[in-house]
């Protein structure tokens, strides 16, 4: 008699995705972040659902409702801080997952890669709208500053901003719609994840060598299920250490002050995972130019398959490209640091140089170095 997991219509899909899936025998720990992102999404949806049961999306009561969750709801503080710090873990996993794809040339699966970039945009939008919900000072001013960027769009800009606001400033209508979008987007993300996996399983996983691994495949279960469990344990350990020991480490103290449209915080800045993009935005003196640079700083990921000029897929055997890649990573750290600094000398010029380097490495230096390596290998 045949096994139910191989015949049952539903169990068959799960079997082909997580059990009998042929996987390369040599994928490293860098391949763990896909499953960790799935876990992060589940944690965020569950904690978010419980928070939504007690949260009120009204300007008068939003801040108080978050305080009520932390003080009066059973383990409300735990749920709230798991959700807030879960977002940080989500972003760390995202950056490492994308970085892995760049290093090992996974972007040559361009449907999987492009859906991944769309997912990145969707997660960033969700995180931004979630940051507005507690209705603290940084929530309010962050929403005001970021939505105002759309006014840089010629002709329709101002109308568009007022349409998004639902009025002439960030107010009750804005908060209510942001809550609605923040609630629905994670489910759209979950659906996109399915499509992401669908396209990935058409080709199978890449591996560190970048070579075709069809001749050497092993079943996903038990080998990679047990490996994923190790990743899960480390992620949960890190998240819980953060939540239980220093839950406000990555937050902004300004968000413990209720939103006040009459006083502006001295330094308006987003959550740490947006600081690199914020630094790029601020490094251009022109409003429209800054907005375009901000969008392009993420959209540039879609160009990776076109900019790949090396004869090898992975960077595993390309030491020159490796050096350039790690310089680019260091540049990202520099941008993150600059994004959190005030707009004054010497931070302005450092931010501008780091922004130029960020784009130049991707558009010019990496493709050039790839061609040099081809020549060195007489290809």
UniProtKB/Swiss-Prot annotation:
- Mostly located where? mitochondrion
What membrane topology does the UniProt entry give?
Multi-pass membrane protein
- Cofactor note as given: Binds 2 heme b groups non-covalently.
Binding residues for a ubiquinone, per the UniProt record?
A: 201
> Do you know which InterPro entries this protein is assigned to?
Cyt_b/b6_C, Cyt_b/b6_C_sf, Cyt_b/b6_N, Cytb/b6-like_sf, Cytochrome_b, Cytochrome_b_C_euk/bac, Cytochrome_b_N_euk/bac, Di-haem_cyt_TM
**Residue numbers binding heme b b566:** 97, 196
The UniProt entry, under SUPFAM superfamilies, shows:
a domain/subunit of cytochrome bc1 complex (Ubiquinol-cytochrome c reductase), Transmembrane di-heme cytochromes
Q: Where in the cell is it found?
A: Mitochondrion inner membrane
Q: What does this protein do?
A: Component of the ubiquinol-cytochrome c reductase complex (complex III or cytochrome b-c1 complex) that is part of the mitochondrial respiratory chain. The b-c1 complex mediates electron transfer from ubiquinol to cytochrome c. Contributes to the generation of a proton gradient across the mitochondrial membrane that is then used for ATP synthesis.
Q: How does it assemble?
A: The cytochrome bc1 complex contains 11 subunits: 3 respiratory subunits (MT-CYB, CYC1 and UQCRFS1), 2 core proteins (UQCRC1 and UQCRC2) and 6 low-molecular weight proteins (UQCRH/QCR6, UQCRB/QCR7, UQCRQ/QCR8, UQCR10/QCR9, UQCR11/QCR10 and a cleavage product of UQCRFS1). This cytochrome bc1 complex then forms a dimer.
**Name of this chain's protein:** Cytochrome b
């Amino acid at each position: 008699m045949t096994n139910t997991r191989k015949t049952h219509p539903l169990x068959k899909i799960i079997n082909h995705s997580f059990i009998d899936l042929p996987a390369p025998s040599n994928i490293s720990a860098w391949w763990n972040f896909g499953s960790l992102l799935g876990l992060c999404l589940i944690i965020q949806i569950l904690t978010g659902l419980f928070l939504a049961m007690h949260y009120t999306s009204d300007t008068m009561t939003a801040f108080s409702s978050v305080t009520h969750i932390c003080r009066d709801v059973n383990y409300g503080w735990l749920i709230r801080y798991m959700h807030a710090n879960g977002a940080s873990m989500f972003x760390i996993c995202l950056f490492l997952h994308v970085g892995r794809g760049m290093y090992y040339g996974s972007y040559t699966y361009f449907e999987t890669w492009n859906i991944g970039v769309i997912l990145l945009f969707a997660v960033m939008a969700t995180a931004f709208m979630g940051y507005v919900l507690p209705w603290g000072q940084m929530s309010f001013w962050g929403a005001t500053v970021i939505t105002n960027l759309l006014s840089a769009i010629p002709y329709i800009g101002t109308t568009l901003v007022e349409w998004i606001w639902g009025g002439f400033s960030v107010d009750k209508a804005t908060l209510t719609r942001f809550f609605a979008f923040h609630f629905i987007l994670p489910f759209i993300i979950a659906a996109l994840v399915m499509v992401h996996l669908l396209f990935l399983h058409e080709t199978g996983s890449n591996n560190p060598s970048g070579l075709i691994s069809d001749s050497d495949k092993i079943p996903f279960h038990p080998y990679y299920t047990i490996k994923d469990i190790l990743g899960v344990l480390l992620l949960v350990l890190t998240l819980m250490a953060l939540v239980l020991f220093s839950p406000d480490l990555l937050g902004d103290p300004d968000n413990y002050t209720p939103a006040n449209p009459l006083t502006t915080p001295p330094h308006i800045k987003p959550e740490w995972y947006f600081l690199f993009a914020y630094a790029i935005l601020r490094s251009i003196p022109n409003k429209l130019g800054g907005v375009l640079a901000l969008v392009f700083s993420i959209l540039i990921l879609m160009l990776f398959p076109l900019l790949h000029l090396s004869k090898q897929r992975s960077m595993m055997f390309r030491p020159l490209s490796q050096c350039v890649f790690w310089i680019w990573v260091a540049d990202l750290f520099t941008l993150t640091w600059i994004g959190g600094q005030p707009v004054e000398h010497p931070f302005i010029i450092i931010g501008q140089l780091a922004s130029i380097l960020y784009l130049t490495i991707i558009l010019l230096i990496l493709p050039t170095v790839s061609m040099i390596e081809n020549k060195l290998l007489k290809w």
